[in-house]
Amino acid sequence: MSVENSQIREPPPLPPVLLEVWPVIAVGALAWLVAAVAAFVVPGLASWRPVTVAGLATGLLGTTIFVWQLAAARRGARGAQAGLETYLDPK
């Protein structure tokens, strides 16, 4: 069964609200922060401490790499990650 090019439809673009990354980063960081505070305040959750600290550190590392790549894309570096046009300021 062959499908001709004229019959293939492109999927619709995602709504802009689903392309925003900063709310996802904020919610994830807040969730790890709440879990870390709970792990250090509630004695029964002491076994969570290493996991929550690792979660905070991993989130911080990932956010740092994203911001670094965003800065590289803004200045037009050749090695910058592709596809960050959504986050660049129109100048």
Curated annotation (Swiss-Prot):
Membrane-crossing ranges are: 22-42, 53-73
What is the protein name stated in its UniProt record? Uncharacterized protein Mb0903c
Q: Which UniProt keywords apply?
A: Cell membrane, Membrane, Transmembrane, Transmembrane helix
User: Which InterPro entries does the UniProt entry name for this protein?
Assistant: DUF2530
Q: How does it sit in the membrane?
A: Multi-pass membrane protein
Q: Where in the cell is it found?
A: Cell membrane
Q: Does the keyword Transmembrane helix apply?
A: yes
